[in-house]
């Protein structure tokens, strides 16, 4: 890999990281607002960021895509979609990928993704919790 390629790659990673900082801070602020306005009875902040982030990634993918009205370079798309939306949501990439499957006529794959992904996430959370709980019970340091 040449030095120019390394610089280009490093610049892309820096853009994605900067977008992630913006998205992550925005998500945190939504969470703080939710706690003070709505309390802790329901995860409104997560619902809000996932819905709004899914809207933003879908909108930006269309408006800045090859047939879109807005010219955006690959780096700009990565900054917004991978960085900001990825840092802001826990759901936008999954939503976009599932929508793309539906839009391109792969309804069965989209349905499988809708069923398998959330269940896998829940199982993974459960397993992670189980492993950590058992580790916490071990004696010693």
Swiss-Prot record:
Family: Belongs to the fluoride channel Fluc/FEX (TC 1.A.43) family.
Encoding gene (name): fluC1
Record-linked HAMAP family: FluC (MF_00454)
Annotated protein name in UniProt: Fluoride-specific ion channel FluC 1
Subcellular location: Cell inner membrane
Record function comment: Fluoride-specific ion channel. Important for reducing fluoride concentration in the cell, thus reducing its toxicity.
Species of the source: Rhodopseudomonas palustris (strain BisB18)
Family matches, as NCBIfam families: crcB, PRK14206.1
PANTHER family on file: FLUORIDE EXPORT PROTEIN 1-RELATED
Membrane-spanning segments: 12-32, 44-64, 79-99, 107-127
Protein residues bound to Na(+): 86, 89
Superkingdom: Bacteria
